[in-house]
Amino acid sequence: MSTERSSVSVPSNWREDNRAMWDERVPVHVAGEFYDLDGFRARRDVLRDFETAEVGDVTGRTLLHLQCHIGTDTLSWLHRGAARVVGLDFSAPAVEAARALAAGLGHGPERAAFVTSDVYDAAEAVPEASYDIVYTGLGALCWLPDIRRWAETAASLVAPGGFLYLAEFHPLTEALDDATGSRIVHDYFRRGAQVWDEPGTYADPDAPTVHNRSVEWQHTLGDVVSALAAAGLRIEFLHEHDVSLFPRFENFVVQDGYHRFPAGHPRIPLIYSLKAAKG
């Protein structure tokens, strides 16, 4: 069972705690059924239908994936026609796993490159100055204390005429009870660092783990949109979706490959997605 402690300040070792937690979980994710890398090698695409519809045709375009983990989404865009993809993650084991996956599929670094770096240092770490598409999300932003700095970094990497695409779990869900998602039990506007101590991983809750401390932050929808606008990007759309990728609430059912509320339950947004263009 997880425990949470909120703090008004940023714990000095937040990055080290989070990196140790993610580093330890990479082998579990590589070997487990959740990411199903053998299945990925066969089907070569794990992107969600709303993402591919909203991003559109990527043929011949360059794409940077911030906080890419083990690279399955990154490589899916390559398989959909991107000319070159670059994935960035702060976990060295995750990047090594992504490189191995790419190499096993026959992709050299000229087509699929993976870089180890903190996302705030991405502009100095990635091989190109800018990309046609900067892609991120689905569990990425909660690990970052400064959303404005993230937006400035991401915007700086979007090529003129290009865009940032973000799909992320809706922050409203973090204000609701875990059982049914029907009651407001947490402050939507809470700002402090949230410190968790939780063994296992979303991919395997029973996996034995040692590095279980992590630090997260909640960013409201207004925070994210405003940060991107302040960074000079033009918001082209903001969409909300009534599906999730995991059983966020205990009463969820699986339908059409997504987790969602059962029939008759009032719906709320579970994921949001946005496109923000430069120029």
Where in the sequence are the language-model features?
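A short SAM/SAH-binding and catalytic strip from SAM-dependent methyltransferases
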Residues: 132-148
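Conserved alpha-helix/loop element of class I SAM-dependent methyltransferases that forms part
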Residues: 33-62, 76
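Conserved class I S-adenosyl-L-methionine
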Residues: 163-202
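A short glycine-rich, Lys/Arg-flanked "PGG" loop and its adjoining helix->strand segment in the class I
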Residues: 148-163
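Class I SAM-dependent methyltransferase SAM/SAH-binding core
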Residues: 62-123
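N-terminal, positively charged/glycine-rich alpha-helical extensions of SAM-dependent methyltransferases
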Residues: 1-38
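A short acidic, Gly/Pro-enriched loop at the edge of an enzyme's catalytic core
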Residues: 120, 124-134
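Short alpha-helix
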Residues: 215-238
